[in-house]
Amino acid sequence: MPIFKSQSNSIVQWIILTWVFLLSHAAVADQIKAIPWIKLKTESSQAKQICQALKVNCGKDVEVWKKQSGADTHLYLTDDTPQLIEFIKENNQYVVLNSWSFQQYQHHGRNSDFDKELNNDGLSIYPAFYPLNHQKLAIAVVKRWSTTYSGGGRAEEIADFVMLEPNHAYKLALADVAFHSYEMIRACFSQEEYQSSPHCHDESGSNLSIQFKDIGKEYYQWRLNFTDFNWEAFKPESSKVVEKSYNIVVPFQQK
């Protein structure tokens, strides 16, 4: 009996250790997330001074960012051209570490319906890093179309996810991904309707979120989660219809 009891305890300990190991790895896997940027408060004059100190030609809408988490001291500058400049402040001087220009970038978000119905608003860089593996990161280069209605409007955004590489280089990782859309159409036209209706617009839209999983290959698996909603006019918010779908992809393996 003592021998059996000892073996039983060993088995129980082994099972517990195995579960701890699996759960710890699952927790690590769950920690693979996109890295949002935080916008730093900079006046336009300060942004201009930073551009001059970095000796770079900046366009309009200059913004300075840092990563939301971690002790990383790297800073990031974006503008409307668009371009991304990675730099640090060292001994009260700004030093460029790398830069990527997307001024001549040929975006893969080509939708003939958008081009016919909406205005092309050009490209922008979304303020976040998207992990490709333990070392490589991508950014979303977003193409936007929009238009305005009387009392509403519509916007469509498509993203190319681009891997950043040294020496100003980049490589397309994932193309033509629905990133964000929104449409609002006015449905109330009288004072009585505005006063009595719980909702005076037809609204619909879609948003993308991404989950990352290490599958033991060169690049993480990306689960593209799409959340679509439709909220009809004259109905309370509780009647809003939300639908979810997803697509599983691996960067650089797009067909």
State what each model feature region is.
Residues 71-77, 132-145, 217-226:
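Acidic/hydrophobic-patterned starts of short beta strands in beta-sheet-rich repeat architectures
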Residues 61-70, 119-134, 209-217:
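Structural signature of eukaryotic scaffold interfaces centered on beta-propeller domains
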Residues 75-135:
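Short N-terminal edge-element motif at the start of the domain
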Residues 24-25:
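N-terminal signal peptide c-region/cleavage motif recognized by signal peptidases
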Residues 34-90:
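Basic/polar, acidic-poor N-terminal "presequence/leader" segments
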Residues 2-15:
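Bacterial N-terminal signal peptides that target proteins for export
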